[in-house]
């Protein structure tokens, strides 16, 4: 593992010396759902030691909706993620807290489960994993002191930001208490996203990567509660204004896909700088490799982790 990390560090130094920035990171999510998935996920995490990635992000749902949201399971997942050989960042999904009120999940209070996630997975200003990544957390702001899960960091001229946007309609439309939670959390998310875009607009920076759990339903949710409409509009507005490569990486749908779903509101043209990447999900256990290369006009290259060789 040390040799692999040293090789990655040398590669980053070499690219910096040549005037380019080149590195890779890993993303996966929506797994492990059940106990029988755990060995495959452990193997996936362990394999990252030799994959030459700078860090890994799990975009939510570390259990199935029908699995109890117990403290014990949360602690098992924390240990699993903390054993990662590379820095590990976790973004919460709906199965991890908003859906914990369901009978099979244990009839927990979702707000209590989110508090437990914050206690276990975001105890300080570093990532999980045996190698640590220093993070800026939104909770540093007194106004948003609860939102430790929202993190930001900069690497190789790219701003990375995480948002707590789970599936299951983003915790909207179930009852008044959850609707209040939704409104407060989305206010925090929009503030944090605005700050990340402002940071990415700096002359010395090249692009922005946003991580969240939910598929924001770019095609709309006609006739159903829509907890993502304002997020879709915010992404559209920011992508058009930033005019730099921007990725949204999410889970929730359990299907690997890459597309460019946003169009300019004024003329209907595709926003070519914005790309959505959705990761694999249970029952499939795999990860997505994203390569960053400042010499690439599109900046980002995306491929399947188990089949994509490490960059030279």
Task: Describe the function of each predicted region.
Residues 6-15:
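Bacterial N-terminal signal peptides
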Residues 68, 73-185, 260-293:
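Extended active-site neighborhood of metal-dependent phosphoesterases/phosphodiesterases
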Residues 18-73, 205:
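N-terminal active-site segment of His-dependent metallophosphoesterases
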Residues 21, 37-44, 59, 70-77, ...:
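Stable alpha-helical elements in mature extracytoplasmic
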Residues 30, 60-61, 93-94, 213, ...:
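Active-site glycine-centered loops adjacent to acidic/histidine catalytic or metal-binding residues
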